[in-house]
UniProtKB/Swiss-Prot annotation:
This is Small ribosomal subunit protein uS19. Coiled coil: none annotated. HAMAP family: Ribosomal_uS19 (MF_00531). NCBIfam families: PRK04038.1 (NF003121), uS19_arch (TIGR01025). GO terms for biological process: ribosomal small subunit assembly; translation. Belongs to the universal ribosomal protein uS19 family. Keywords: Ribonucleoprotein, Ribosomal protein, RNA-binding, rRNA-binding.
């Protein structure tokens, strides 16, 4: 049986680079949420917006808002007024993780509490219809270091320097 030559991968990279030179830059596709553009969503009344979001969010919005959420709505309106005047809106800090992101919140920066700190998130079009809590995870990936002295049975007999 004859051995096949292993592919080094160098030739393919050159071909890809040539192809990239000939291709025109990609145009950004206009954002649509369930068939509606961002401008249409922002003009839409909240009752109509509730009809197009998923059932979990629709149920949360139908229950009404708590006093803490009402305070957040007031902060959003104040920040929106500042941005309309041309001033830079500050970060809106909140503990309300169960608040549904509405189209009027797009473009604002939120400090969402994750149980330890406020994660600063600038809301973009793709976040419409999600919860604020989805943007700031409460659990991070743990990367452990090497075990300490006496942590394992094998390290009992290793001389300490």
């Amino acid at each position: 049986m004859a051995r096949q030559k292993k592919y080094s991968g160098k030739g393919g990279a050159r071909k890809k680079n040539k192809q990239k030179q000939n291709v025109a830059p990609r145009r950004r596709v206009e954002f649509k949420y369930k068939g509606f553009s961002l401008e249409e969503l922002q003009e839409m009344p909240i009752k109509k917006f509730m009809e197009i979001v998923p059932s979990r969010q629709r149920r949360t919005m139908a229950r009404g808002i708590t006093p803490k959420q009402r305070k957040l709505v007031m902060k959003i309106k104040k920040a929106r007024r500042l941005t309309n005047r041309g001033k830079d809106a500050r970060v809106i800090r909140t503990h309300c993780r169960d608040f549904v992101i509405t189209p009027e919140m797009i473009g604002l920066t939120f400090g969402i509490y994750n149980g330890k700190e406020f994660k600063e998130i600038k809301l973009v079009e793709e976040t419409v219809g999600r919860f604020l809590g989805e943007m700031a995870p409460t659990r991070g990936v743990v990367q452990h270091g090497s075990p300490g002295m006496g942590a394992t049975r094998g390290s009992m007999f290793v001389p300490i320097k």
